[in-house]
Design a protein with these regions (language model features):
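Short glycine-rich anion-binding loops that position phosphate/pyrophosphate groups of nucleotides
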Residues: 12, 66-67, 122-125
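Surface "functional belts" at beta-alpha junctions
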Residues: 23, 32-35, 90-137
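Residue-level detection of beta-strand scaffold positions
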Residues: 4, 21-24, 59, 79-83, ...
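DPxDG-like acidic metal-binding loop motif
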Residues: 62-96
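N-terminal beta-alpha supersecondary unit
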Residues: 1-65
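Phosphate-handling active-site elements
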Residues: 49-58, 85-94, 109-112
């Protein structure tokens, strides 16, 4: 049984989730905006307390690695690195735009030649964007 702590801070949403064998067992989100420095520590503490209280060994930490808010990314990656260093577990970097494409692939029947173009607001009338095929290539 594998348990992964998931951290998302690349957008205006700050979220921490824990999953065990692909099933979500803990979720905390702040949808109000850029307060990651305040929310993340509390959310991670609650998630680790939940995991430890259920005697579930934490196997890895996954963190969004951008693109996205530079400050948000630094906060999330720093927290993830600290947890991994302290517990001697692997750190998994997850491309933010790739993750945004996954629900579309899972829940929609797309033609073989479909292209996906996830976007995140980069502010100042710009966006972070990528183009993926159905294999996320």
């Amino acid at each position: 049984m594998s348990c992964i702590l998931n951290i998302e801070t690349s957008t205006s949403v700050c979220s921490v989730a824990a999953s065990q064998d692909g099933q979500t067992i803990f979720v905390k989100e702040d949808l109000k905006g850029p307060s990651h420095a305040v929310s993340l520590g509390v959310f991670v503490d609650e998630a680790l307390s939940f995991i430890d209280s259920h005697a579930i060994p934490l196997d890895a930490v996954a963190v969004s690695c951008g693109p996205g808010s530079y400050t948000g990314l630094r906060i999330g990656v720093s927290m993830a690195k600290g947890i991994c260093y302290g517990r001697n577990i692997p750190l998994i970097g997850i491309p933010t735009l790739e993750v945004l494409s996954v629900p579309v692939l899972l829940y929609h029947d797309l033609p073989e030649n479909a292209l996906l173009c996830p976007m995140i607001d980069a502010r100042r009338m710009e966006v972070y964007a990528a183009v993926y095929d159905r294999r996320l290539q």
